[in-house]
């Protein structure tokens, strides 16, 4: 692979993460603000907070997973898959899905906390951006390792780290959100 191709791949890969990041923040800033106060009152009295948070988390996983899949398909379409093996494409796609799942679980938890605290998009950004940086850094390292041809066994720990972050954010929201739900 020529050096120019690697540089353009890095630039496009970084742009793909920016698209995913903005899509995630825009997706989580809308739903709660659009809820009517009567709908919120109904939800508070009929739905357990854990169930509501799990539903939001699943919604964001599907939404960001779809955006990630489209972004990854565009990445392959515009860059071509000539230098990828079939196995590398699957490994890279697994990284994209793990990243979108970690982002979705983080943003669902942050959005729920920010909404109950009376904050809007700015609070989501302030709370979420510092926490999302490790996700992007690990994902970027994982993608770079795959592009350089490093064996999957030597870089699979990044996927485990993303899965751990996703589970940790979900568990944190599951445990803490009920205390904010009924005030």
Provide a role label for each language-model segment.
Residues 95-129, 181-183:
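A structural motif at transmembrane helix-loop-helix junctions in multipass membrane proteins
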Residues 13-29:
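Long, hydrophobic alpha-helical segments
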Residues 105-109, 135-148:
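Transmembrane alpha-helical segments of integral membrane proteins
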Residues 24-43:
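Transmembrane helix boundary and interhelical loop/hinge segments in multi-pass membrane proteins
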Residues 1-7, 12:
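Single conserved hydrophobic/aromatic residue that forms the stacking wall/gate
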Residues 77, 166-183:
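Junction motif at the cytosolic side of a transmembrane helix
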Residues 49-76:
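Selective transmembrane-helix segments that form parts of the transport pathway or gating/packing helices
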Residues 73-95, 143-159:
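Membrane-interfacial helix-loop-helix connectors in multipass membrane proteins
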């Amino acid at each position: 692979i020529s050096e120019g191709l690697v540089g353009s791949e890095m630039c496009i890969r970084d742009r793909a993460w920016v698209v995913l990041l903005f899509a995630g923040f825009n997706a989580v800033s809308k739903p709660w603000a659009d809820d009517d106060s009567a709908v919120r009152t109904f939800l508070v009295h009929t739905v357990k907070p854990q169930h509501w948070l799990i539903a939001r988390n699943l919604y964001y996983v599907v939404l960001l997973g779809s955006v990630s899949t489209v972004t990854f398909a565009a990445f392959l379409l515009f860059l071509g898959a000539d230098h990828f093996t079939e196995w590398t494409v699957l490994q890279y796609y697994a990284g994209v899905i793990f990243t979108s799942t970690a982002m979705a679980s983080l943003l669902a938890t942050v959005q729920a906390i920010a909404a109950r605290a009376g904050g809007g998009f700015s609070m989501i950004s302030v709370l979420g951006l510092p926490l999302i940086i490790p996700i992007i850094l690990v994902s970027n390292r994982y993608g770079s390792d795959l592009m350089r041809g490093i064996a999957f066994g030597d870089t699979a720990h990044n996927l485990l780290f993303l899965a751990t972050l996703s589970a940790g954010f979900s568990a944190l929201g599951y445990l803490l959100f009920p205390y904010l739900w009924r005030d």
